Regions:
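Mg2+-dependent phosphoryl-transfer active-site scaffold
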Residues: 2-5, 61, 66-67
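Short beta-strand/loop motif that positions the catalytic acidic residue
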Residues: 43-45, 49
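Histidine-bearing beta->alpha loop at or near hydrolase active sites
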Residues: 48, 73-98, 102-103, 120, ...
Length: 154
């Protein structure tokens, strides 16, 4: 499939028809339903996101039965996610998820730094013990060089 077709299907299904929230979404012949999500979720939204307003992202909480950690990041659609630790970075968290985004915002605490740090702690609580990574490279796919790769170094 071409990327235009995929993008068109995504926008039509998720934005215009809101199929995912309504439990009517299909992907590659599989029915997708937010109500089927059981594992803990970490949802990040950006306060200045002009494409997905954070208040809309917050509404996800009402559609999943799973425990949710909702985090509001400084920045916009891209900068809110690619938000490395630094003097301008901040994020907000709350201990509970009240019914509305406005109530959440009133009870949330603002933290200096990147939401990445919060996510690392959250993920560590749910992860197993650290293990050594598997060896890289195979006979058919030999190692080309050390990471991150020549293309990154320019």
């Amino acid at each position: 499939m071409h990327s235009f077709y995929l993008r068109s299907c995504y926008l039509r299904s998720c934005y215009l028809e809101n199929r995912l929230v309504r439990g009517k979404m299909e992907l590659a012949g599989h029915h997708l339903d937010l109500a089927d999500i059981k594992q803990d979720l970490y949802i990040v939204a950006a306060i200045n996101d002009h494409i997905v307003p954070w208040t809309s992202s917050y509404m996800t909480i009402g559609h999943v039965p799973a425990p949710v950690r909702f985090v509001l990041s400084s920045g916009g659609h891209i900068a809110g996610i690619v938000n490395p630790p630094g003097p301008k970075a901040w994020y907000m968290t709350a201990e509970t998820n009240p019914p509305t985004a406005q109530e959440w915002h009133q009870t949330a605490t603002r933290h200096a730094g990147s939401w990445w740090e919060d996510w690392i702690s959250w993920a560590a609580e749910r992860a197993g013990p650290m293990v050594d990574p598997p060896p890289v490279g195979k006979r058919k796919y030999p190692v080309l060089g050390d990471g991150p790769g020549e293309y990154v170094r320019g």
